[in-house]
Amino acid sequence: MGCSKGVRFDADVDIPDLSGKVIVVTGGNNGLGKETILQLAKHNPAKIFMGARSEEKAATAIREIKESVPDARITFLEMDLASFASVKKAAQSVLSSSSRLDILINNAGIMATPAATTEDGYEIQFGTNHMGHALLTKLLLPLLEQTANEPNSDVRIINLSSSAHTQAPKEGLLLSEVKSPMASTSTWALYGQSKLANVYFTRQLAKLYPRIKCVAVHPGSNVGTNISSSLKQSSKLLIPLIFISNRFFAIPV
């Protein structure tokens, strides 16, 4: 799976009316997540949960979105994907306050960070980008399935992956090592591993839950976000080269 030309998409025209829909977007206070919420809010959903760690930053993002969409119904959802306890609390908040869930967008992520582990002992990128989202999805699946069983439903799980999944270790997912910092493995390979896990997870979800449309989406290599904020400037210069190499050295998944 390599890079390919994208399909022309006009959010104002191509997103349908979302009246009555309930949506969860992780990492919604900045970058892709914030823009996603902005575009969805234009189409009248009943509620959008903005997953974020900081209530202050989320409040700022919500205020800025409402400058463009004054009637946007956006609710802050406190969530730290590096903490299973936080993810469970966030999921319970959704389940206790909403009778339906139409769209789950697992957008939040970190990239090429220094070696570390999550609160629960997983390699930080694998734990944040994959394990946190996998747990959130599992906990919300009963509500997603319930909604999918309703007439004329269109329930979706969108996982933000990346063509950088091709940078994963040549052995694939090193599952015997993910409960450690994996400091001897390059940070780029660890990022690729987390993105490869996103792709595998999405494929399995699609098999197990045919009533739910499950897709893994590569957002593009020239999208302006702060995901690379932890990188040194010299490392940031390598990002375009990594995506170029994906075109020529992609491995199938």
What are these regions (language model features)?
Residues 194, 216, 240-253:
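C-terminal helical subdomain
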Residues 3-232:
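Rossmann-fold NAD(P)H-dependent dehydrogenase/reductase core
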